[in-house]
Regions:
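Nucleotidyltransferase catalytic cores
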Residues: 9, 152, 156, 160-277
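Conserved NTP/Mg2+-binding pocket subregion across the NTase superfamily
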Residues: 15-16, 84-191, 198
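Soluble or luminal CAZymes and related metallo-dependent hydrolases
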Residues: 23, 27, 81, 253, ...
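Glycine- and acidic
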Residues: 14-18, 68, 243-248
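Helical scaffold of the NTase/Pol beta-like nucleotidyltransferase catalytic core
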Residues: 2-5, 9-47, 77-79, 276-277
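Catalytic metal-binding acidic patch
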Residues: 48-86, 99-104
């Protein structure tokens, strides 16, 4: 099925938000100004994507997703200055602590992401600012979404940097990531990690079945309707997400059920299960 869906004109989301009405617009503008101040002429472009652009953004809960493209490779940037800026900025806006995902990537690396050995510098929820040496091709889902749905906050059009990515490539990456989530160890993991895994798998299944990429909330509702016997677990994941990991999954029943549910969804995604939806 995946091989038959090779449409470059497919959009990732069925709806878009007005740029002037996006959530946290003042915060985003201030953060963009800080990033520009540190990078100066090294900044090629800065792009906002994710739920703050395409919908499903929950104030006080959702992350902000940004990609900063730079003219040099990330190893040549003043990473200490960027880290200090992140720390100071979140200190002024503590409600955004652990809610920023900013990816810094060199223009040449992003432009040839399928084959490039280049690195990324990333700050993300639960992780400090650091250089990641994994293949940038593993971030294909991000590159697709920022290219198809992102808002340019500064610089050149992202389509002039990221080469075209087909829907079938995005879909295949979604399937691979779902399988990775299934195989991750969640022994002793925090409640937020478990909720993220459940909702990520719901979204992956909905993406494969409906051929559209939507929000976690849309995916949860879609899966809940089709698998009512698992509604209680999906609801627990949603409640945990809204509490930012402070509520939910407090008993072994929920945690054990999580692994069963994730395996079931992964089998559905990979087409190994009986078609039941």
């Amino acid at each position: 099925m995946i091989g038959e869906l090779d449409r470059q004109d497919r959009v990732a989301e069925p709806h878009y938000m007005n740029r002037d009405e996006r959530p946290a617009a003042d915060f985003v503008a201030a953060l963009a100004s800080e990033i520009r101040g540190v990078l100066g002429d090294d900044l090629v472009g800065l792009y906002l994507y994710g739920s703050s652009v395409t919908g499903g953004f929950d104030p006080g809960v959702s992350d902000l997703d940004l990609v900063a493209v730079t003219s040099p490779e990330v190893e040549a940037l003043d990473l200490d200055a960027l880290e200090q800026m992140h720390h100071a900025f979140v200190g002024r806006y503590p409600e955004w602590r652990d809610r920023l995902e900013i990816v810094y990537v060199g223009r040449a690396t992003l432009g040839s992401f399928r084959t490039s050995p280049g690195s990324l510098a990333v700050i993300s929820p639960g992780e400090p600012f650091h250089v990641r040496n994994e293949r940038v091709a593993e971030w294909l889902q991000n590159w697709y979404l920022v290219r198809e749905t992102g808002i340019c906050l500064f610089g050149v059009d992202i389509a002039a940097i990221v080469p075209p990515i087909t829907w079938s490539e995005f879909l295949a990456a979604t399937v691979r990531y779902a399988d990775e989530v299934r195989n991750q160890s969640r022994l002793g993991a925090g409640d937020g990690v478990i909720a993220y895994a459940i909702l990520t798998m719901c979204r992956a299944l909905r993406t494969v079945r409906t051929q559209t990429h939507g929000s976690k909330q849309e995916a949860a509702a879609w899966t809940r309707e089709r698998m009512p016997e698992w509604a209680w677990l999906i609801d627990e994941a949603l409640a945990c997400r809204l509490s930012r990991g402070t509520a939910g999954f407090e008993d072994e029943r929920s945690r054990a059920a999580t692994e069963t549910f994730i395996a079931l969804l992964d089998d559905e995604i990979l087409g190994r299960a009986t078609n039941r939806m």
